[in-house]
Structures are given as C-alpha cells and as structure tokens.
C-alpha cells in the first residue's frame, strides 16, 4: 500500500520532475532511490523519469504526491511528446540561469533545483525570468565568448527569434523537423573551401548567412568540430540560432545561396528542409 507523503513542496516554474522529486528526498532525508521505491517506481535514475515516464510510474508518483497525473507529465523533459533528437541533454545541464540559481539557493527547500530549460539545446534565455543563460560545463566555460563580442551583439536579436522558432517547432509540431535539420546543416563544412576566409579552420555553411562566423569560431573555439549532437556552447549556439531565423524568414532567397555551397551528400536533406520551410 503506497502511503501519500504528508508534506509536499510546491514545484517551481519550469522545474524538472526529477528535481522536484529530488527536493522531496532531501526534505525527508532519504536517498532518491529510496523515495522512488516508496512510490513503487522501478527506475534506473531520477533523470530517466524525465526522459521516459511510463504510465505506471506516472500513476504511482501521482498517488504518492497527491498530484494530478498530467501535472507530472508536464514536468518531464518532453511533456509527453517525442523528444527532438540531439537537442536534449541526457544527464547534466548544458547551461543555467544564474539569476534563478541565486533565487533557489536563498531557501533550503528550493536549493539545488534544476529547470527543464537548462537541458534544452535551443535555449539562449531563461523562460522563467528572461535572463541570459550561461554555459556551465567546464570545457564550454573555458571557450566562452563575451556577450559583448561584436558578432554576438550583432546577431542577438535574430538569435532570440531563432530560439522562438525552435521552441515552436519542438513544442507544437515535433513531427516537423525542418528547423532542427536547418540548425544541423548550418554547421556543415562548405563544399568550396577556397571561398572561405584564409584564416578559417573549417569553412562552415553558416558563414554564408552570418558573415564573419568562420573567423569568430576560429578565435573563440579553436579546434571546434561539428558535434554528434546539437548541444552547442552558447558562443556557437547564438550565431546558429540567428542563422536559423534569417533563413526561415526568406527560405527561397537563401536556397539559391546555400544549396550551391553545401556538399553533394548533404544537399538533398537541406533542399528538402528549405522546401518545407518555404511551404509552411
């Protein structure tokens, strides 16, 4: 027989389910695993519940916490929808909101809380307070560019627009991956490297849309290679999102410029992406 918890801590805006459960474990001075067992949940880790909450576990937690099942589902990483490939950190946050961290740390019951947006690879600003998100992984922090960098300042407005485009794509129409495909494609090497800046490491397609990106990347992230996922450091993510916004605004205009610049193997996927954007 599952016993409901006598005292419940209210969830924070944008808080992950694992964070909310973890704060209760700390409050009751038990381990996270023990709390899950008390709920009748057999999960490998707290984080696994964020990524794949089964109907059984959802019911068990809802009973223990005297909370509506749908409220729990909305606290998961995908909110019950399909997660966008490569855009969600599976374990540790990519970025944090310093303002929210300070606010959480001011109260023992909220200290250590983690927000959903800290794991999402299309975010540049906090959906709770609007503050700029900051890299928190050591390697990304080492290569962090100043927000006042001329290129970052020049594309900031378009980056915010790109963030909204990705948010819309992920939340409202997860089946349409055009914006995500475009985000990936903009980091592809260009087909004709002799057209690049002579000082660029690997000439990227994004430099066609954001002039000066190749030199910026060389200066701020030497040795950067296109990653297997889209969990990019902020200094790279901001220009990429700005590029997404510019292309989405005028897909037919950019089709003429981007398709000749990309390699043969990547051209069909990019062409399909641009065609879908033009029809949307």
Which sequence ranges carry the predicted segments?
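Basic, alpha-helical nucleic-acid-binding regions used in initiation and control of genome expression
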Residues: 1-280
């Amino acid at each position: 027989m599952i016993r409901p918890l006598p005292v419940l801590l209210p969830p924070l805006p944008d808080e992950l389910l694992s964070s909310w459960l973890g704060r209760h474990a700390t409050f009751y001075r038990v381990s996270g695993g023990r709390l899950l067992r008390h709920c009748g949940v057999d999960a490998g880790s707290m984080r696994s519940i964020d990524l794949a909450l089964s109907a059984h576990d959802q019911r068990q937690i809802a009973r223990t916490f005297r909370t509506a099942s749908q409220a729990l589902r909305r606290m998961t990483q995908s909110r019950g929808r399909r997660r966008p490939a490569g855009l969600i950190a599976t374990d540790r946050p990519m970025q944090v909101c310093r303002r929210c961290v300070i606010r959480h740390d001011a109260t023992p019951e909220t200290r250590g809380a983690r927000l959903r947006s800290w794991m999402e690879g299309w975010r540049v600003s906090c959906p709770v307070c609007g503050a700029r998100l900051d890299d928190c992984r050591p390697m990304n922090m080492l290569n962090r560019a100043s927000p006042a960098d001329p290129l970052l300042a020049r594309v900031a407005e378009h980056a915010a627009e790109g963030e909204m485009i990705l948010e819309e794509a992920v939340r409202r129409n997860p089946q349409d991956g055009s914006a995500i495909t475009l985000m990936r494609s903009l980091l592809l090497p260009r087909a004709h490297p002799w057209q690049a800046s002579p000082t660029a490491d690997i000439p990227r397609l994004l430099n066609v849309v954001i002039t000066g990106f190749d030199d910026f990347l060389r200066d701020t992230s030497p040795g950067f290679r296109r990653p297997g996922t889209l969990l990019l450091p902020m200094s790279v993510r901001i220009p990429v999102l700005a590029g997404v916004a510019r292309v989405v605004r005028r897909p037919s205009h950019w089709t003429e410029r981007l398709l000749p610049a990309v390699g043969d193997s990547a051209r069909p996927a990019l062409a399909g992406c641009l065609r879908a954007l033009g029809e949307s």
